[in-house]
Amino acid sequence: VPTFLMIGILGRGDRRAAAWKITIYLGLGSIVLLAGLVWLANATGTYDMVKMVAAAGSIDPAAQKSIAALLIVGFGTLVSLFPFHSWAAPAYASAPAPVAMLHAGVLKKFGLYGLLRLAIPLVPEGLEFWLTPLLVLLLGNILWVGWVTISQKRLDLMLGNSSVMHMGYIFLAIAALI
């Protein structure tokens, strides 16, 4: 809601469309992420992170695959993982500079941090199962969005797409940990 208001009221250009787009994408991503977190808590029998890590080995491998998929899509939407990336560049281009900096510099990193702290230690078998499709999506971030970035004529859209492309490199480094 705050992002919607900051972009929708204080933004420039096609700010209303960008505000709606970011709200819908991040809202749907949050719902998917919430489903994964609730399933993870039910699989471990607790919402306490310390107990959850201790019980992570008892999660059924089939459940790990499903939970990992939900966490990848949920956190991937926040990080603007390809193909859930189309909200980022228009939002950054329409947002006031401080709002764009907040999203690109801080909020996207929450998605990566969530993967590092939750997905990797709690559902490692599920992440291993999804590693190849994840690498294909990461290549989409790096190659496709890189091509879109190079072809941009507007600097604000170029910077927005560049941020998305660089998240692919960071996500790729995290995938190397799996």
Where in this protein do the model-derived segments appear?
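Short beta-alpha junctions and helix-cap segments that line functional grooves
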Residues: 19-20, 146
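Membrane-helix interfacial "entry" motifs
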Residues: 14-19, 93-97, 101, 124, ...
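C-terminal ends of transmembrane helices
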Residues: 5-14, 79-93, 142-162
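Membrane-interface helix-loop-helix modules in multi-pass inner-membrane proteins
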Residues: 1-6, 75
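Juxtamembrane/interfacial segments at transmembrane-helix boundaries in multi-pass membrane proteins
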Residues: 15, 21, 30-86, 90, ...
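Short hydrophobic "helix-edge" motifs at membrane interfaces and signal-peptide entry regions
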Residues: 67-69, 98-99, 143-144, 156
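Small-residue-rich segments of transmembrane alpha-helices in multi-pass membrane proteins
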Residues: 2-4, 23-37, 97-98, 102-113, ...
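Transmembrane alpha-helical segments of multi-pass small-molecule transport proteins
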Residues: 69, 133-149
